[in-house]
Amino acid sequence: MTVMPTTLKRTCATPGLAALGLAAVFFAATQPAFAQSESSWSNQGLIYLLGPTLDGTSGIGPIDTDVDMSASDVFETLDGAFLGMYRGEGERWGVMIDVVYMDLKAEGAGDGGAFSGKVEVEQTTAIASATYRLSPSTQLMAGALYNDVSAGISLKGPTDRIREQSAGDDWVDPIVGALFETPIGAGNWSFTGSAQIGGFGVGADLVTILTGSFSYRFNNWSSIDIGYRYLDFDYEDGDGLERFKFDMKEHGPAIGWRFDF
């Protein structure tokens, strides 16, 4: 049995700094709008758990590996995770920052089943958006998505020859969308849904984000959220041994604790 390790590391500090800088600009830009009525500015945090299903293809160099992981598979192979969101809002303008970090592993088959392989994926996704309220129930959203993915593949062929490769890439995508929220009846329940689309060839070819959740408010500062989250990334860059592909759908139920501060 022969092992041929190959390591490809690709980093891009500028997009990462750009995403953080853009988030800061969004936050600063919203402040003047509330200078006349500071009491109208509200802060909200959300910490949540996600049970994602992963379905797609991860490619490093000339090797593509299919990934198909259920929520139970994800939890079995989860090495670490953090999921949180901040939302600040005034009378019209606001800001939202959503961060998801996951470290997972998967097994799959590629090239029509001729090869078997293992894939390790570490992913950080951060979304920073400015919001503008059109009505009591509807807001427009525009901002940037920063995605950092590190992947490793161990591939075994028909002759039991093993080839290992690892690579990583990060990129920034513009995103636009809308958010809808409404109370349900006169009680403590409410519904929130959002749809965002981005990429447009700037980083990824296309990014789609859909979320929906029902909230139950326990008191005047906290509530529980139960919902569903869908993310679809279509990204490919480079060629030959420098090629990196991340064509992945991540979707599943989410439950979280929302609190005002």
List each language-model region with its residue ranges.
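Short glycine/proline- and aromatic-enriched beta-strand/turn motifs that initiate or cap beta-hairpins
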Residues: 35-106, 185, 260
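Solvent-exposed loop/turn segments connecting transmembrane beta-strands
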Residues: 76, 196-208
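Transmembrane beta-barrel strands of outer-membrane/channel proteins
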Residues: 45-51, 97-101, 142-146, 193-197, ...
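Membrane-embedded beta-strand positions in outer-membrane beta-barrel channels/transporters
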Residues: 82-85, 125-131, 175-179, 211, ...
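Outer-membrane beta-barrel "beta-signal"
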Residues: 248-261
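Repeated loop/turn-to-beta-strand initiation elements of outer-membrane beta-barrel proteins
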Residues: 92-97, 137-140, 186-191, 221-224
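Residue-level signature of outer-membrane beta-barrel architecture
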Residues: 88-90, 132, 180-184, 197, ...
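Flexible, solvent-exposed loop segments that connect beta-strands
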Residues: 57-73, 103-121, 149-169, 235-246
